[in-house]
UniProtKB/Swiss-Prot annotation:
PROSITE patterns: PHOSPHOFRUCTOKINASE (PS00433). Its cofactor is Mg(2+). It is found in: Cytoplasm. This is ATP-dependent 6-phosphofructokinase 1. The keyword Membrane does not apply. ATP binds at G14, K78, G79, G115, D116, G117, S118. It catalyses: beta-D-fructose 6-phosphate + ATP = beta-D-fructose 1,6-bisphosphate + ADP + H(+). One of its GO terms (biological process) is canonical glycolysis. Pathway: Carbohydrate degradation; glycolysis; D-glyceraldehyde 3-phosphate and glycerone phosphate from D-glucose: step 3/4. GO terms for cellular component: 6-phosphofructokinase complex. The active site is at D141 (proton acceptor). Substrate binds at T139, I140, D141, R176, M183, G184, R185, E236, R277, H283, I284, Q285, R286. The record marks G117 as: Important for substrate specificity.
């Protein structure tokens, strides 16, 4: 049995399916080595709290969580600790509080599960405060460099595909154009994969320009062939024909992507008079039972992260390539944003299927 260690684990950024499967894998693997695992609540906020908000994790506690969505530890995607928003509207550097919380717990290492933004913040904290960090990539957007698969992506694709499957019947029954708006931020991975798997007729992603004239021609051409409906899937950050990225703003003044589906519907209705409906999938893509692939990758990532700690190989992230886990420096991974390559094999597949994908 290896030397006993105390390790912390936290989830940071937006939630997704597969996070609990990672936590379960870490606890199983670490417990087998005689180590203790401490779950940190609400990302770095748990280390900022006094006393730190943590709980020791046991196998019987995490075992039922393999399939469950969300994160048992809670998470947040707000509050950069280096410019933390205060009640009076000012911003304060509270990074030292997080670092102190880590050392107060006498942890030997920290496993951080997050997207590129979260991993960048955690790495900065680790460098500043002598934190032994290992990273695990998660994001439904699948835009983290080097890894072919980030936790949560496959489940999000499955959900978007099922939505297209269901919309197919309504579109055909009412002779409508049905538009499905999906997440993904500035990367079109969800729309591309789900569009192919769900039989979309038009796939629009931020990386490839499109023409409203061509979309309308595609719809009319289908009608001439006796196909009285059309399925369109669009990624949330696709621009209008004028180059504008549409956003929605809440009562607090916070903006997020949204509105491209309605924009397309109005354009299509005005140009060719087609009856058009929009479905915005939203946060449904983040929840629910994790897909088998997400559970598989999450389990492999959790074990690999523990093994990195045992080897004292810190400031590394686990990644998925060619159906196996590799390890890469966190700095290298977060520096390589992964958008859809217009020459990607899936783009060629979509074009080969006759799907309109832009110019």
């Amino acid at each position: 049995m290896s030397k006993s260690r105390r390790i912390g684990i936290l989830t940071s950024g937006g939630d997704c399916s597969g996070l609990n499967a990672v936590i379960r894998a870490v606890v199983h693997c670490a417990s087998g080595k005689g180590w203790e695992v401490f779950g940190i609540r609400q990302a770095t906020l748990g280390l900022m709290a006094r006393p730190p908000q943590v709980s020791k994790l046991e196998i019987d506690q995490v075992d039922p969580l393999l399939t469950s969505g969300g994160t048992m530890l809670g998470t947040t995607n707000k509050g950069d600790p280096f410019a933390f928003p205060m009640p009076d509207g000012s911003f304060c550097d509270r990074s030292s509080e997080i670092i102190a919380g880590y050392h107060q717990l006498d942890l030997d290492a920290l496993i951080g599960i997050g997207g590129d933004g979260s991993l960048a913040i955690l790495r900065r904290l680790a460098q500043q405060g002598a934190i032994n960090l290992v990273g695990i990539p998660k994001t439904i957007d699948n835009d983290i460099g080097i890894t072919e698969h980030a936790i949560g992506f496959d489940t999000a694709v499955n959900i978007a595909t099922e939505a297209l499957d269901r919309l197919h019947f309504t579109a055909a029954s009412h002779s409508r154009v049905m538009i499905l708006e999906v997440m993904g931020r500035d990367a079109g991975h969800i729309a591309l994969a789900a569009g192919i798997a769900g039989g979309a007729d038009v796939i629009l992603i931020p990386e490839i320009l499109y023409s409203m004239d061509d979309i309308c021609y595609h719809i009319k051409h289908r009608q001439e062939e006796g196909k009285n409906y059309c399925l369109i899937i669009v990624s949330e950050a696709v621009r209008t024909q004028d180059g504008e990225i549409l956003t929605l703003t809440n009562r607090l003044g916070q903006s997020r992507y949204g509105g491209i589906g309605e924009y397309l519907a109005d354009q299509i209705s005005d140009r060719i008079g087609a009856e058009t409906r929009v479905t915005v999938l939203g946060h449904i893509q983040r929840g629910g039972i994790a897909s088998p692939l997400d559970r598989l990758v999450a389990s492999a990532f959790g074990v690999a992260a523990v093994n990195l700690i045992e080897a004292a190989k810190y400031d590394y992230m686990v990644a998925w390539q060619n159906r196996q886990v590799i390890t890469v420096p966190i700095e290298e991974a977060i520096a390589q944003y992964k958008a859809v390559n217009p020459e990607d094999a899936l783009v060629k597949t979509a074009r080969g299927l006759g799907i309109y994908l832009g110019e």
